[in-house]
């Protein structure tokens, strides 16, 4: 995190509508029910590997909705649906992983949210820290430098 700007600090200042959190919690609860005993037989049998094709298909369907004649504004309902399908895949994969012990690579959707939030804050020090980048080109350059450093740090951790 950049100069004391943690994700909790950032979230506190964002004013995320309560409705957003409620809807997300509902989605997670529905997936929990689908994967639980007495839930859906098909959903309960899925693995990361079996779900990959659906994630790819849904991502392509988002692209199609964006590129459709008239653009995303003309097809907002379709785009909402397709983005929901991609979000479902994130929640689904997270739920599958949650069923595994943490020591064996398990995680939950809160871990995914924490990781992406931290990454966005870390890669935007011009917004959340003391760095400056006022043009899109400067932002892209800074982003590339931060991403390269993250790769180097990951490689060093693997070698350790």
Predicted feature descriptions by range:
Residues 1-83, 88-160:
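Flexible "arm" and connector segments at domain edges
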């Amino acid at each position: 995190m950049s100069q004391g700007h943690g994700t909790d600090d950032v979230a506190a200042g964002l004013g995320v509508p309560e409705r957003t959190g409620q809807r997300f919690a509902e989605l997670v609860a529905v997936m929990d029910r689908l994967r639980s005993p007495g839930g859906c037989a098909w959903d309960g049998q899925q693995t990361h590997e079996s779900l990959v094709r659906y994630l790819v298909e849904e991502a392509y369907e988002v692209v199609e909705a964006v590129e459709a004649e008239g653009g995303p504004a003309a097809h907002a309902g379709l785009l909402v649906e397709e983005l929901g399908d991609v979000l479902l895949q994130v929640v689904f994969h997270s739920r599958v992983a949650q069923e595994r012990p943490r020591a064996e690579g398990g995680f939950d959707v809160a871990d995914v949210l924490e990781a992406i939030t931290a990454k966005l804050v870390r890669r935007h020090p011009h917004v959340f820290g003391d760095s400056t980048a006022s043009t899109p080109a400067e932002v892209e350059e800074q982003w590339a430098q931060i991403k390269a450093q993250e790769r180097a740090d990951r490689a060093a951790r693997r070698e350790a």
